[in-house]
């Protein structure tokens, strides 16, 4: 999609951009970040992991950066018009941030969680995550988001 916007292709629809921004807000911010910020990070802090100047602080900083980039993407769509440069810059930065963030989660945060949190605490966190998905995100939302991704894959990744 980003390449289509950058190359000024007509098939990039402002509605698609709004949909992908909505996807990012729900899946990334309302679900994934909330799981970490409301449940995982406090549990890690109680287990002795530093927030400030530590791995939690780094992750929180990246969450903040991601929210700002999503905001910039959203602001690039005004009155059904796309400010292509703003969108492409913000989306490209977001992709790079996300890759870096996921690598930190996979190589540092999640292994650290496995070593610092007891099995019972991890079970409790999983239950909290499931409740969040059901009660905040809503039943069927993941399926809806998956269908949206399949649509975009067919449209933009040919």
Where are these regions (language model features)?
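Small-residue-biased structural context
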Residues: 1-158
């Amino acid at each position: 999609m980003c390449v289509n916007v950058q190359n000024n292709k007509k098939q990039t629809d402002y509605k698609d951009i709004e949909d992908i921004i909505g996807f990012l807000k729900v899946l990334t911010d309302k679900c994934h970040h909330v799981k970490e910020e409301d449940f995982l990070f406090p549990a890690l802090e109680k287990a002795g992991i530093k927030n400030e100047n530590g791995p939690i602080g780094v992750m929180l900083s990246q969450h903040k950066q991601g929210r700002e980039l999503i905001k910039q993407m959203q602001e690039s769509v005004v009155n059904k018009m796309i400010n292509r440069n703003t969108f492409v810059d913000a989306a490209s930065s977001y992709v790079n941030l996300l890759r870096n963030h996921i690598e930190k989660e996979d190589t540092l945060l999640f292994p650290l969680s496995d070593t610092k949190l007891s099995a019972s605490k991890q079970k409790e966190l999983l239950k909290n995550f499931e409740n969040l998905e059901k009660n905040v995100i809503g039943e069927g939302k993941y399926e809806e988001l998956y269908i949206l991704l399949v649509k975009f894959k067919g449209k933009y990744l040919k």
